[in-house]
Amino acid sequence: MNFSVGLGRDDAEKRLVQNGVSRRDFMKFCATVAAAMGMGPAFAPKVAEALTAKHRPSVVWLHNAECTGCTEAAIRTIKPYIDALILDTISLDYQETIMAAAGEAAEAALHQALEGKDGYYLVVEGGLPTIDGGQWGMVAGHPMIETTKKAAAKAKGIICIGTCSAYGGVQKAKPNPSQAKGVSEALGVKTINIPGCPPNPINFVGAVVHVLTKGIPDLDENGRPKLFYGELVHDNCPRLPHFEASEFAPSFDSEEAKKGFCLYELGCKGPVTYNNCPKVLFNQVNWPVQAGHPCLGCSEPDFWDTMTPFYEQG
């Protein structure tokens, strides 16, 4: 897989077809991204244009203290597959999980990308350990915070994918022995935060498209694009009518839960969580609450501490 050259519209569409993705599916995905951005169906061609442009910007994707779940969520999306849609149409010059290079060759690729004359956009996955000069988190013999600081200094823009890079994530949970922090807090830089554990790839793709077509989106006080994180999960939940009728499931295996009764008394954090999960779903198929699991509030800062216990006795 070639990550260094954008395919262009014709070649990109051929690649999609070869991977079993029809143009109809591709445009449907673009329409979903457009809708998530708060735009009408007429904006879908603009999304398609941004994703199949011949000359793509350089992207450096750093992994810090994390589980790689955000990458896994992104590369396992369907219709169209993210490798055919995104990874082949941007100049993804460094991404440890999927790049072919390893060891010194990988480090050389990172150095080359950071010194490129055309600049780059930085994607960060994972929190930053800060204690003892960041030595609790090392990659290639360098503290994660040192490498990220260097990359952030010249970046055209910084997108934090996942709650770990946005706010510190599970590494920051009490007692936080490594003094982990999110990128913005640790480095004092402005970031576009796409939180979630993992975040919906639609929100990540939408943020990328917005940056390429319209610039930095309007952000809330926590650095999240209001386009994707402007409404409470609760307000768009299909179980909301049952909440308003005070119809609560007494247990996860109850008939009431199967009938769609509200999961609030079982620990659902939808009433205090900003995200668009009920609207865009995961892989356009399902999302936790619809599947019978309470919202954990994973797109909120410090949710590992502030949203626990995740489950309550009904």
Curated annotation (Swiss-Prot):
Cofactor note: Binds 2 [4Fe-4S] clusters per subunit. Binds 1 [3Fe-4S] cluster per subunit.
Main location (coarse class): periplasm
Annotated catalysed reactions: 2 Fe(III)-[cytochrome c3] + H2 = 2 Fe(II)-[cytochrome c3] + 2 H(+)
Gene encoding the protein: hydA
Any one cellular-component term (Gene Ontology): membrane
Family: Belongs to the [NiFe]/[NiFeSe] hydrogenase small subunit family.
Binding site for [4Fe-4S] cluster 2: H234, C237, C262, C268
Named cofactor requirement(s): [4Fe-4S] cluster; [3Fe-4S] cluster
Oligomer and partners: Heterodimer of a large and a small subunit.
Compartments where found: Periplasm
Keywords: 3Fe-4S, 4Fe-4S, Iron, Iron-sulfur, Metal-binding, Oxidoreductase, Periplasm, Signal
Any GO molecular function: 3 iron, 4 sulfur cluster binding
Function recorded in the entry: Involved in hydrogen uptake for the anaerobic reduction of sulfate to hydrogen sulfide in an electron transport chain. Cytochrome c3 is the physiological electron acceptor.
Signal sequence annotation: 1-49
Keyword presence, Signal: yes
Residues bound to [4Fe-4S] cluster 1: C67, C70, C164, C197
Lineage of producing organism: Bacteria, Pseudomonadati, Thermodesulfobacteriota, Desulfovibrionia, Desulfovibrionales
Protein name: Periplasmic [NiFe] hydrogenase small subunit
Highest taxon above the source species: Bacteria
Enzyme Commission number, as recorded: 1.12.2.1
Name of a matching Pfam family: NiFe_hyd_SSU_C
Residue positions binding [3Fe-4S] cluster: C277, C295, C298
PTM annotation: Predicted to be exported by the Tat system. The position of the signal peptide cleavage has been experimentally proven.
